[in-house]
């Protein structure tokens, strides 16, 4: 904790001059990421044996092209705002041709601290009749901050925990995945012309 840092405190119910929990909000601000891997399309309908068989039959060049780890996460910003990070723009034709799918990326809009817990707000984006960007079906995900320092964060919901690492630059996220998506889109355009 440094002079000038914003803090969230949970006071001791028996002694209001003491805190049972101190969260340095300056450490919490930033871009927090974790790694996701794709799964075979229709993996939910396949047995583990069937998935292993399909993967073994897949050429290495296809695996190198499509089995690329991606960074997902959220950006904790000032004024209680948050933003999803990790989106990779793909051509619809390329996505349809891909043998894999990535987990859906949450759409985060806000955050706050409530009774010492980290709450992040997410929803479903859409465009209204006027073409304005809106968010519906907002819901709160509430987690304990199991660990926090300048570049590491662990959130826990009581059943599972997820570790995050901090990125300093939004433009560094998913560089390899972005390059491959761009290359595949160019290939599709060339093949269709």
Task: Mark where each language-model region is.
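Short beta-strand element of the conserved SAM-dependent methyltransferase core
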Residues: 22, 75-76, 164-165
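Residue-level recognition of conserved beta-strand edge/terminus positions
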Residues: 10-12, 35, 156
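Contiguous, well-ordered beta-strand patches that form the walls/edges
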Residues: 37-46, 60-152, 156-160
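Edge beta-strand at a domain terminus
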Residues: 26-29, 102, 137-142, 147-193
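OB-fold/S1-family single-stranded nucleic acid-binding modules
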Residues: 12-26
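Tryptophan-anchored aromatic micro-motifs
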Residues: 25-65, 184-192
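Short nucleic-acid-contacting surface segments enriched for D/E, G, S/T with interspersed K/R
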Residues: 1-8
């Amino acid at each position: 904790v440094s002079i000038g840092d914003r803090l969230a405190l949970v006071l001791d119910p028996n002694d209001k001059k003491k805190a049972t929990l101190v969260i340095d909000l300056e450490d919490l601000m930033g871009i927090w990421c974790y790694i996701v891997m794709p799964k075979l399309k229709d993996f939910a309908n396949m047995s583990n044996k069937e998935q292993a068989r399909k993967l073994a039959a897949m050429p290495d060049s296809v695996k190198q092209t499509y089995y690329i780890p991606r960074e997902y996460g959220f950006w904790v910003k000032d004024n209680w705002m948050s933003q999803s990070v990790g989106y990779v723009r793909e051509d619809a034709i390329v996505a349809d041709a891909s043998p894999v799918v990535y987990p859906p990326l949450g759409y985060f809009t806000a955050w706050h601290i409530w009774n010492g817990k980290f709450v992040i707000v997410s929803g479903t984006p859409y465009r209204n009749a006027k073409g304005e960007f809106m968010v519906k079906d907002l819901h709160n995900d509430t987690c304990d901050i199991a660990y926090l320092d300048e570049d590491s964060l662990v959130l826990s919901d009581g059943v599972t925990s997820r570790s995050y690492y901090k990125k300093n630059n939004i433009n560094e996220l998913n560089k390899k995945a972005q390059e491959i998506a761009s290359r595949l889109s160019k290939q599709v355009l060339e093949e269709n012309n």
